[in-house]
Each structure stands twice: as structure tokens, then as C-alpha cells.
């Protein structure tokens, strides 16, 4: 990744907020960016754009759609 982590996470936060997600930096896992839907934690984004989530969420159509939206945001920021 060419961008530094702080700039990368700032861009991700902005993009995710546009899509209705909340974010926070985690105190563990090396300060990853945690993504929430306002109520439930959906996963963590690492500094290289990797997304960690519960694989069981992929079986729920609503959660799967949310995860796909998060992945699209990551991809858009990585391309910019």
C-alpha cells in the first residue's frame, strides 16, 4: 500500500460513513479499523486492506450484503 495507514483509514472512514457504517480504531489487533452497522460489529479492516469478519455472517443475506458493501469501499479506496 502506498498510502500511510492514518491517511488510508481516514479515507476508509469517510467512504464507510457515506454508506451508513460507523468505525472506530481497535485497542487490540494492532489498531485495525473496526466497522459497525450502528448496533453490531461487522469486522475489522487491517492496514493492507484485509477485512476480517465472522464467516457465519455470510450465511445471513443482510449481513452478506453489508460485508460486500464494506469490501467495495475497501476496493474503491485501494484504487484511488
Functional labels for PLM-detected ranges:
Residues 1-3, 75-80:
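Short intrinsically disordered terminal tails
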Residues 1-29, 61-64:
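Negatively charged, low-complexity tracts enriched in Asp/Glu with abundant Ser/Thr
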Residues 13-17, 68-78:
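Residue-level detector of alpha-helical secondary structure
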Residues 14, 18, 35, 44-47, ...:
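Generic detector of low-complexity/intrinsically disordered segments
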Residues 25-40:
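Ser/Thr-rich, low-complexity intrinsically disordered terminal regions
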Residues 40-66:
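Intrinsically disordered, low-complexity regulatory segments enriched in Ser/Thr/Pro
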